[in-house]
């Protein structure tokens, strides 16, 4: 990958073809400025010697995050573009899933702008109230308000376990856009999760459950099988691999939940703004601009819901194609699949290739046949006198809990 070409304004350029026959373009420029060190406080003497620090706010950090989490994937010693799905693969492979899910979807209407604001808490309510006031004053432009501001996530980054971690990028849209689309999508979230649960016939999306309830659900899945095993599915950088075709399938589910044609059409217009993303990021010493077709933007209102929906639908379709009975535990792109030991080989065979044809790099984690070794959302089940509970890795927990950002 070469970033040596420079335009008339001094911007370095990366210009690559996308899956729509167009071009995804990245431009960046270094300016005079001092990178900002992000401050944190550590309680000394209580944690193992694990190096956990946040990234510096600088153009090099932001540029690397954009390159490796949006534009490129690791390919041996170098990089290549993320895999893209075969044409029409979502409508073909997920047709049976859609036929199962559609009758279970809610039939609803959007909440008012005011109700959406009232449902927010703290600083968010103030910001969305300001956005509502601006929208009522006529200050809403879909093209401008759907643009994204990107920055490096301020988080505790483990640099011991991962010797060269890639910074994570947050990419929110404007508050007026989020207000407009949020009144449709936010009330849908739990309803669609329940629809997914009914489609599978058991609790599937574990989002929002506490450590005790999560462990209870996982144990029920484990005990459903006579000779159980569990397989973790690791979708490498899931957001980066969400293609335009995947987004269109996901958006179709949302629109099907609204009774009135005018609501379907208005939501469709708002969601179409997520199909081609225009992003800008600034640091004290530089600026990044890029446009990209498809790709999940981490700050979108439907990031959590959409990732759960896509992952559950694909695992459902894959298990049906293999003829394997499974019990799925899902929390976005984090998945564990339970099944009979005798069906493990059938399930695993061809999985990576099947998901690659859907546009996703899916790795199979080592199979476990002890319940205590099941890992879900960086926790494992532990037996206590009061029952099962999900617990974090003790070393990592002590290190991260002794640091305040």
Protein language model regions, located:
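Viral RNA-dependent RNA polymerase
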Residues: 1-405
């Amino acid at each position: 990958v070469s970033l040596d070409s420079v335009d008339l304004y001094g911007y370095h350029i990366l210009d690559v073809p996308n899956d729509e026959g167009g071009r995804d373009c990245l431009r960046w420029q270094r300016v005079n400025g001092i990178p900002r060190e992000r401050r944190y406080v550590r309680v000394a003497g209580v944690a193992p010697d694990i190096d956990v620090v946040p990234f510096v706010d600088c153009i090099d950090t932001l540029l690397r995050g954009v390159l490796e989490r949006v534009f490129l994937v690791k390919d041996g010693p170098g990089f290549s573009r993320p895999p893209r799905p075969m044409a029409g693969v979502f409508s073909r492979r997920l047709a049976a899933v859609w036929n199962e899910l559609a009758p279970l979807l809610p039939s609803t209407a959007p909440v008012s702008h005011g109700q959406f604001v009232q449902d927010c808490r703290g600083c968010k309510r103030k910001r969305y109230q300001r956005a509502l006031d601006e929208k009522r004053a006529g200050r809403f432009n879909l093209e401008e308000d759907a643009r994204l501001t990107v920055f490096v996530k301020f988080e505790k980054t483990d640099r011991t376990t991962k010797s060269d971690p890639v910074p994570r990028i947050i990419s929110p849209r404007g508050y007026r856009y989020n207000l407009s689309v949020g009144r449709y999508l936010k009330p849908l979230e739990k309803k669609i999760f329940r629809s997914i649960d009914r489609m599978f016939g058991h609790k599937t999306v574990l989002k929002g459950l506490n450590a005790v309830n999560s462990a209870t659900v996982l144990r029920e899945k484990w005990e459903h099988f006579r000779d159980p095993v569990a397989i973790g599915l690791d979708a490498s950088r899931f957001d980066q691999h969400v293609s335009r075709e995947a987004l269109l399938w996901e958006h179709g589910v949302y629109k099907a939940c609204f009774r009135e044609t005018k609501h379907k059409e208005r939501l469709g217009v708002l969601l179409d703004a997520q199909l081609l993303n225009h992003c800008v990021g600034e640091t004290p010493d530089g600026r990044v601009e890029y446009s990209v077709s498809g790709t999940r933007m981490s700050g979108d209102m439907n990031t959590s819901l959409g990732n759960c929906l896509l992952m559950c639908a694909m695992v459902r379709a894959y298990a049906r194609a293999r003829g394997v009975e499974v019990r799925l535990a899902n929390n976005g792109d984090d998945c564990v699949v339970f099944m009979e030991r005798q069906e493990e080989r059938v399930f695993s065979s061809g999985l990576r290739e099947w998901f690659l044809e859907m546009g996703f790099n899916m790795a199979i984690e080592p199979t476990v046949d002890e319940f205590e070794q099941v890992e879900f959302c960086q926790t494992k089940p532990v037996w206590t006198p009061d029952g099962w509970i999900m617990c974090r890795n003790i070393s990592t927990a002590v290190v991260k809990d002794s640091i305040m950002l």
